[in-house]
Amino acid sequence: MAVEKTNSSSSLAEVIDRILDKGIVVDAWVRVSLVGIELLAIEARIVIASVETYLKYAEAVGLTQSAAVPA
């Protein structure tokens, strides 16, 4: 995936539109320790995308499989 460079500035609306179109994932892991004792651990994965973009990529990796309905 190539990074596109332009000389013109982008408006906030264009940036938000691009993020929703392509999607962005923030994966964070934080651990707070004091004298070797873990006090707090936080793991987070934040996905920012439009519903259409999320469903397209989630289907590709098998996250949208529906539960079978008994007949």
Swiss-Prot record:
Keywords: Gas vesicle. Induction: Gas vesicle formation in this filamentous organism is restricted to specialized filaments called hormogonia which differentiate at the tapering ends of trichomes. Transcribed during hormogonia differentiation in red light. Probably part of a gvpA1-gvpA2-gvpC operon. Transcription is maximal after 6 hours, degradation of the larger transcripts occurs rapidly between 9 and 12 hours or upon a shift to green light. All transcripts disappear between 12 and 24 hours. Gas vesicle formation is induced during hormogonia formation (growth in red light for 1 day) (at protein level). It is found in: Gas vesicle shell. Residues 51-70 are annotated as: Alpha helix 2. GO terms for molecular function: structural molecule activity. Residues 12-22 are annotated as: Alpha helix 1. One of its GO terms (cellular component) is gas vesicle shell. Pfam families: Gas_vesicle. Residues 38-46 are annotated as: Beta-strand 2. Residues 26-34 are annotated as: Beta-strand 1. Residues 35-37 are annotated as: Beta turn. PANTHER family: GAS VESICLE PROTEIN A1, GAS VESICLE STRUCTURAL PROTEIN 2-RELATED. Belongs to the gas vesicle GvpA family. The gas vesicle shell is 2 nm thick and consists of a single layer of this protein. It forms helical ribs nearly perpendicular to the long axis of the vesicle. Gas vesicles are hollow, gas filled proteinaceous nanostructures found in some microorganisms. During planktonic growth they allow positioning of the organism at a favorable depth for light or nutrient acquisition. GvpA forms the protein shell. This is Gas vesicle protein A. It comes from Microchaete diplosiphon (Fremyella diplosiphon). The gene is gvpA1.
